[in-house]
């Protein structure tokens, strides 16, 4: 996978940036995504994610992770199948609040790295069409999330 990370905080430990890349690569392989699939992850503070949450979701508070899925199927562009195969699928962007990562890790009694990995996997699953708004959706997403985390080695 082509994973781009952006650290708007300019404070994140390089090992955590590696963790993001590693766990998303692992999750992509777990879901059998094409190796050229693209995703971006931006780390930020609460004030920035609060602004994004308010603007795009109409929720006036910071949150831990926001997923922006990208649908590459633009109806205005007509491509033959060969051309479509050559263009990598960009599944979207994740925005993660490092402040929320720290708060939630402390509250839940586990490491910052475990919480960061969890939020990456959680957001990644959203970008791949999983949701938890309805009970039946939760029953698909949450066990898969746990399965990926455990297989990667970030157990609770």
Curated annotation (Swiss-Prot):
Localization in the cell: Cytoplasm
Residues making up the signal peptide according to the UniProt record: none
Tree of life domain: Bacteria
UniProt cofactor(s): Zn(2+)
Chief location category: cytoplasm
Gene3D superfamilies found in the cross-reference section: Metalloproteases ('zincins'), catalytic domain
Keywords tagged on the record: Cytoplasm, Endonuclease, Hydrolase, Metal-binding, Nuclease, Ribosome biogenesis, rRNA processing, Zinc
Zinc in keyword set: yes
Protein function: Single strand-specific metallo-endoribonuclease involved in late-stage 70S ribosome quality control and in maturation of the 3' terminus of the 16S rRNA.
Listed name of the protein: Endoribonuclease YbeY
Organism: Pediococcus pentosaceus (strain ATCC 25745 / CCUG 21536 / LMG 10740 / 183-1w)
């Amino acid at each position: 996978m082509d994973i781009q990370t952006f650290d708007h905080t300019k404070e994140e430990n390089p090992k955590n940036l590696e963790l993001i890349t590693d766990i998303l690569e692992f999750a992509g392989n777990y879901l059998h995504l094409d190796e050229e699939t693209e995703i971006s992850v931006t780390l930020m503070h609460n004030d920035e994610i609060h602004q994004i949450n308010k603007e795009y979701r109409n929720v006036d508070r910071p949150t831990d992770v926001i997923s922006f899925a990208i649908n590459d199927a633009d109806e205005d562009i007509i491509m033959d199948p060969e051309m479509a195969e050559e263009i990598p699928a960009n599944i979207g962007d994740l925005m993660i609040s490092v402040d929320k990562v720290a708060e939630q890790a402390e509250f839940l009694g586990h490491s910052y790295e475990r919480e960061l990995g969890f939020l990456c996997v959680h957001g990644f699953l959203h970008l791949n069409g999983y949701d938890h708004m309805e009970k039946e959706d939760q029953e698909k997403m949450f066990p898969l999330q746990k399965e990926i985390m455990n297989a990667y080695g970030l157990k609770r």
